[in-house]
Amino acid sequence: MSGEAKMRRATPADRDGIGRLWQEMMEFHRECDPRFFQMKPEALEVWLKHFDECLADQNQFVLAAEANGELVGFAMGRSSDDPPVFDRPAHGFVTNFAVTEPWRRKGVGQRLFGALLEEFRKRGFGELRLSVSALNPASNGFWRRMGFEAYSVSMRRSTG
């Protein structure tokens, strides 16, 4: 593995490569929390349709990290609003973010986040939000290093 990853806008030609990265990301999440991250057999097909819709939607965007002609990471973001009772402007929301395992801890994630942050700034957002599993210490640490802080806690329980 040599060379440096370059950040760019994703295109329809990236569909399969980003799909593979998404599958790797979901497997990583499933290992952290197998109860929550159970996928349907058609999950990839459904997600790829979502990817296509994101590329066509002005309120969403997809970035790719590429090294040596290979996709090594991707990020997705969208605009998001709070309920209308709050006096807060719309904010950016990070919907997906992944770097393939061999390229982690080499600065790719930090640079990909920098490109993501710049895209949100260009779109006029003053705040970003995201969700991260409490059972995923690696991702929690990464997002804290990127300047995020917890402001809400989601909880769950079985009805049984």
Give the location of each predicted region.
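Conserved active-site alpha-helix within GNAT-family acetyltransferase domains
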Residues: 110, 122, 134-152, 157
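Conserved acyl-CoA
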Residues: 100, 111-127
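Glycine-rich phosphate/pyrophosphate-binding loop shared by adenosine-nucleotide-utilizing enzymes
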Residues: 5, 69-74, 92
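Conserved N-terminal entry element of GNAT/NAT acetyltransferase domains
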Residues: 1-16
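Conserved beta-strand in the GNAT
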Residues: 64, 70-79, 98
